[in-house]
Amino acid sequence: MEVPGSSKKMIATQEEMSAAKIALGSRDMCAHLLIPLNKCRQAEFYLPWKCEDERHVYEKCEYELVMERMLAMKKIREEEALAKQNKLQGNAAVPLIPKTANA
């Protein structure tokens, strides 16, 4: 399964995520990294220094997804600003009320 607009592919299946009891909010393109991280956390009694490598890889994946979304939103905002600017310039060519109307 591939999400439109994302450079990453879904690797973990719905069945794998369901079996690993991954929360619905965490079922994104990095879920395949969260499954071994949660297994490590449970095996090591959630000691923060035990699963550093798995956590680092998972958090880097999440960071890359956030940055990808931010760049996409920035591009959308730039396109909207350009469209708005073009619309304003198009209206300026044909004034509806002459500037001398205030006299």
Swiss-Prot record:
Entry membrane topology: Peripheral membrane protein
Domain of life: Eukaryota
Pfam families per record: NDUF_B7
GO biological process terms on file: photorespiration
Domain called CHCH: residue spans: 27-69
Keywords of the record: Disulfide bond, Electron transport, Membrane, Mitochondrion, Mitochondrion inner membrane, Repeat, Respiratory chain, Transport
Compartments it resides in: Mitochondrion; Mitochondrion inner membrane; Mitochondrion intermembrane space
Family that this chain belongs to: Belongs to the complex I NDUFB7 subunit family.
Domain notes: Contains two C-X9-C motifs that are predicted to form a helix-coil-helix structure, permitting the formation of intramolecular disulfide bonds.
Name of the molecule in the record: NADH dehydrogenase [ubiquinone] 1 beta subcomplex subunit 7
